[in-house]
């Protein structure tokens, strides 16, 4: 479950960042110059979020921060879905980046608590392998979907990944809490 969570998270992060500008141009009619600038805002959200997360981590636990991040991603995806003005999508991608910020570091940080310090190094290695598998497979898969179906499906694709992440993370937390 933790491996699928990592796979889904990294797939969501990279698919969001790689396909944002194409989505804005092809689905929202934004100029390429504006779209590329707005897509880079995803990374501003991610960077800002990581800085904020560093301070929040002193006060809140990893589970809370992961859930908070996933909730923020959900809000961002909902904004990308809003069809009225491209500004909603711009803001949505920034918010998705902001929400992504705590997830990766907090999952890594909570691994020793979930699996024990003696197993955590091996578990983190496998988590990273699944993370890179998500990085390498899902953005090209969305490329096929965009090419053969519609690039307008980007928010739905991201939502499916988010549901997968939430389901796997919550199931893992429940299992470990009950042990």
What do these predicted regions represent?
Residues 1-40, 47:
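Extracytoplasmic gate region of multi-pass secondary transporters
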Residues 7, 40-44, 71, 125-133:
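Transmembrane alpha-helical cores of Major Facilitator Superfamily
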Residues 49-61, 146-147:
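Helix-to-loop junctions at the C-terminal end of transmembrane segments
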Residues 64-78:
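Structural signature of the two symmetry-related core transmembrane helices
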Residues 76, 87-95:
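Paired small-residue
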Residues 102-115:
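Intracellular juxtamembrane helix-capping segments at the cytosolic ends
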Residues 117-151:
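A late C-terminal transmembrane helix in Major Facilitator Superfamily
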Residues 157-179:
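Multi-pass alpha-helical transporter architecture, strongest
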